[in-house]
Amino acid sequence: MTTICTLLKDSQLPDSPSARLDTELLLAAAMGKPRSFLRTWPERIVPREANERFDDWIARRRNGEPVAYILGHQGFWSLDLEVAPHTLIPRPDTELLVETALATLAADTATVLDLGTGTGAIALALASERPLWTVTAVDRVEEAVALAERNRQRLLLENVEVRRSHWFSALDGRRFRMIVGNPPYIPASDPHLSEGDVRFEPKSALVAGSDGLDDIRQIVAQAPRHLLDEGWLLLEHGYDQGAAVRELLGARGFAGVHTLRDLGGNERITLGQWAC
């Protein structure tokens, strides 16, 4: 029989920068308890079934599999989302895109499009904050569409429509007050693709050509046909792509183009306004 304290001590993940947190999350979930339980009752015996479940999960984590995929869920904004290996894991940096969208569009009612929705994180976060907005969330991957719809239903967000579309392909000329997106933006040759958690994430949601801008170019080129007059386009991109994305938006005719930095000081979100 093993106590919580002993199991945490003996099951560290030396190769993970968040080793203690990862271990606690896995053990708490294996026991069906909140993390606070582990610290409140460190001498409690871990039940055999929970111990076996934890041993399996910790082995998967040592192999590099992300905690979110092991547990099947991830927190984003104020939401708890189901995740799966055919979608990206929502990241804290992307919350800046949600913050920017909410700050940019002050209207109580609006139509918003989320491109490449994945788990539905961005669309569902916006819809939860603005219940009178009508949000359309699209993804080209059928499994991602099904996952986003499950998250929508579980969160009871009736102001979101989830549908399958490769960017704008299935939108039939519909126009929106705002378009947001976190498209693939990693260059195909980036060595980080073979390192850490990202090894387990779908490359189709990460890689966009030799310079990482192929999908952003396509979105910028097509977005004006789907924006209302004075509508906004907001895009997340790589830390070193701000200047390139600003140039693309400016060349396409967007006004007020500017870039916001994330908490790490990196250029992360670029936006511009369309005027017919």
From Swiss-Prot:
EC number(s)? 2.1.1.297
- On the tree of life, the source organism's domain of life is Bacteria
KW Cell cycle (keyword) present = no
Keyword annotations of the record: Methyltransferase, S-adenosyl-L-methionine, Transferase
Which taxonomic lineage is given here? Bacteria, Pseudomonadati, Pseudomonadota, Gammaproteobacteria, Pseudomonadales
Biological process, per Gene Ontology = methylation; translational termination
Record-listed S-adenosyl-L-methionine binding positions: 116-120, 139, 167, 182
| UniProt protein name | Release factor glutamine methyltransferase
Describe the task this protein carries out: Methylates the class 1 translation termination release factors RF1/PrfA and RF2/PrfB on the glutamine residue of the universally conserved GGQ motif.
Of which family is this protein a member?
Belongs to the protein N5-glutamine methyltransferase family. PrmC subfamily.
Catalytic activity entry: L-glutaminyl-[peptide chain release factor] + S-adenosyl-L-methionine = N(5)-methyl-L-glutaminyl-[peptide chain release factor] + S-adenosyl-L-homocysteine + H(+)
Per the UniProt record, which residue ranges are transmembrane? Answer: none
Q: Which residues bind substrate?
A: 182-185
Gene Ontology terms for molecular function: nucleic acid binding; protein-(glutamine-N5) methyltransferase activity; protein-glutamine N-methyltransferase activity
Cited NCBIfam families: hemK_fam, RF_mod_PrmC
Q: Which Gene3D superfamilies match?
A: DNA helicase RuvA subunit, C-terminal domain (1.10.8.10), Vaccinia Virus protein VP39 (3.40.50.150)
List each coiled-coil range.
Answer: none
Organism whose genome encodes this protein: Pseudomonas aeruginosa (strain ATCC 15692 / DSM 22644 / CIP 104116 / JCM 14847 / LMG 12228 / 1C / PRS 101 / PAO1)
